[in-house]
């Protein structure tokens, strides 16, 4: 390669790197900042599954009472096309009855067990007396001013259509976000109702990471408004240390190192994209998430997170 060609190559590469860095820090130079209809720092996972039975009206009411910014919940559809709030398609874990939500009419759904495992806290259980599986419309009616984060749990066109209809019926487009890890489900949600903001699918999260580490992210338009990701390091506390292999620990460390990037979070939030990290239940996890620039934290313990935020702002 001649010296002239080498100089041109280095100049081009240098110009690209400088431009990429500049737009990473100041994305408004290229992209219009997304309008944020609400801002959520405190997000109650399944309503706060460590303080009340998950996805129940009691859990949602408790979270709203203590001042949560957002309720996170999961939706399925029954045989008679009722949209219900339940995490699992099969109810064996949560009710003790081995049936699928989609195979029963709403009136036939069994109640939740009175004691359930806390999903992201090892060896912890939560007890409660409100064991009824609620309808999504009940949640909308009870909390008309509260932002709600909906995980569409199955790739079902009727479910997506019904959720969209409910959001429109209760005029909640400005207070709702929906999606799933599946890119197919997210695409269907966006096609069904583009007025409801969407979450990044897993495929899109991985794409964003690839674009970030190659310096291309600042040049790429983004349609999603909510970057919702796990903190991989919490996996270590969910299992007994002796059963996690060295290879598994390395993969967790690598995932955590790649995903928990302050520069990435700062760029996304500067573009008006909220960054939510799940599911964190300890104060040091809360602190790390906010120190990294996360917009909000999703927790099973809304009271604990509320106290942390109060102390942080004191």
From Swiss-Prot:
Entry-linked Pfam families: GDPD
GO MF: lysophospholipase activity; metal ion binding; phosphoric diester hydrolase activity
Annotated Gene3D superfamilies: Phosphatidylinositol (PI) phosphodiesterase
Chief location category: cytoplasm
Chain ranges of the GP-PDE domain: 40-309
Record-stated family: Belongs to the glycerophosphoryl diester phosphodiesterase family.
Name this polypeptide is given: Lysophospholipase D GDPD1
Family matches, as PANTHER family: LYSOPHOSPHOLIPASE D GDPD1, PHOSPHATIDYLGLYCEROL PHOSPHOLIPASE C
Coiled-coil ranges (or none): none
Listed EC numbers: 3.1.4.-
Residue intervals annotated with topology Extracellular: 1-3, 217-314
Organism lineage: Eukaryota, Metazoa, Chordata, Craniata, Vertebrata
Biological process according to GO: glycerophospholipid catabolic process; N-acylethanolamine metabolic process; phospholipid metabolic process
Keyword field: Cytoplasm, Endoplasmic reticulum, Hydrolase, Lipid metabolism, Membrane, Metal-binding, Transmembrane, Transmembrane helix
Catalytic activity field: a 1-O-alkyl-sn-glycero-3-phosphocholine + H2O = a 1-O-alkyl-sn-glycero-3-phosphate + choline + H(+); 1-hexadecanoyl-sn-glycero-3-phosphocholine + H2O = 1-hexadecanoyl-sn-glycero-3-phosphate + choline + H(+); 1-hexadecanoyl-sn-glycero-3-phosphoethanolamine + H2O = 1-hexadecanoyl-sn-glycero-3-phosphate + ethanolamine + H(+); N-hexadecanoyl-sn-glycero-3-phosphoethanolamine + H2O = N-hexadecanoylethanolamine + sn-glycerol 3-phosphate + H(+)
Binding site for a divalent metal cation: 72, 74, 87
CC per GO annotation: endoplasmic reticulum; endoplasmic reticulum membrane; membrane; perinuclear region of cytoplasm
TM stretches of this protein: 4-24, 196-216
């Amino acid at each position: 390669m001649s010296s002239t060609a080498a100089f041109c190559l280095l100049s081009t590469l240098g110009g690209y790197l400088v431009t990429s860095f500049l737009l990473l820090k100041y994305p408004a130079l290229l992209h219009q900042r997304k309008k944020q209809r609400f801002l959520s720092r405190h997000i109650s996972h399944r309503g706060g599954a460590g303080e009340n039975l998950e996805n129940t009206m009691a859990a949602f009411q408790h979270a709203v009472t203590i001042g949560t910014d957002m309720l996170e919940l999961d939706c399925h559809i029954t045989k008679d096309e009722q949209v219900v709030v339940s995490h699992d398609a099969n109810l064996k874990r949560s009710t003790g009855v081995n049936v699928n939500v989609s195979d029963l009419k709403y009136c036939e759904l069994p109640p939740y067990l009175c004691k359930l495992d806390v999903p992201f806290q090892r060896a912890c259980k939560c007890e409660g007396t409100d064991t009824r599986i609620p309808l999504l419309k009940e949640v909308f009616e009870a909390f008309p001013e509260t932002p709600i984060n909906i995980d569409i749990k199955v790739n079902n066109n009727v479910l997506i259509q019904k959720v969209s209809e409910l959001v429109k019926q209760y005029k909640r487009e400005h207070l709702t976000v929906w999606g799933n890890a599946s890119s197919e489900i997210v695409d269907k949600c966006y096609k069904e109702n583009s007025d409801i903001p969407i979450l990044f699918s897993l495929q899109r999260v991985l794409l964003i990471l690839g674009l970030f580490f190659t310096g291309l992210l600042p040049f790429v338009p983004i349609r999603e408004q909510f970057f919702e990701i796990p903190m991989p390091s919490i996996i270590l506390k969910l299992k007994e240390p002796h059963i996690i292999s060295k290879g598994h620990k390395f993969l967790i460390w690598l995932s955590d190192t790649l995903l928990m990037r302050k520069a990435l979070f700062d760029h996304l939030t500067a573009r008006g994209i909220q960054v939510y990290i799940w599911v964190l239940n300890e104060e040091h996890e809360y602190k790390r998430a906010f120190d990294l620039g996360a917009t909000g934290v999703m927790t099973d313990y809304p009271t604990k997170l509320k106290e942390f935020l109060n102390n942080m702002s004191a």
